[in-house]
């Protein structure tokens, strides 16, 4: 899950605390943080590592749906929080980006499963282990 973003230049660490140490050493925090893991503490952690007056973008559907965070952090930093919903109607745009070479789909960490392995695919996707970001079930 971390190799692909790192190959694109993202700063990748296992926790917000590790990221915060990196940013403290650089004396610079990112002005925009994209949180797409949906983890239980990820929303609050994204606020913690966003630069003052910056923006935290929460992508997808966080789990659990009710998120708990300290209002002190975004209030003190004067952060903007923006939620980005998923969309069903983006297939044509995505295929065009792949065709034009804007997105390199072959580098995207996807595991493919046969139809009879569908239960395993769902279990693997839910477990979020390893580098897999998506499970694809093929007939």
Feature roles, as predicted:
Residues 1-45:
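Adenosine-nucleotide cofactor-binding segment
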Residues 12-13, 53-56, 135:
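Hydrophobic residues within beta-strands of alpha/beta enzymes
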Residues 12-13, 81, 112:
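Conserved beta-strand scaffold positions in the cores of enzyme catalytic domains, especially
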Residues 21-26, 49, 97, 121-124:
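CheY-like receiver
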Residues 40-102, 139:
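Glycine-rich phosphate-binding loop and adjacent beta-alpha segment
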Residues 44, 88-139:
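C-terminal hydrophobic helical "lid"/dimerization subdomain
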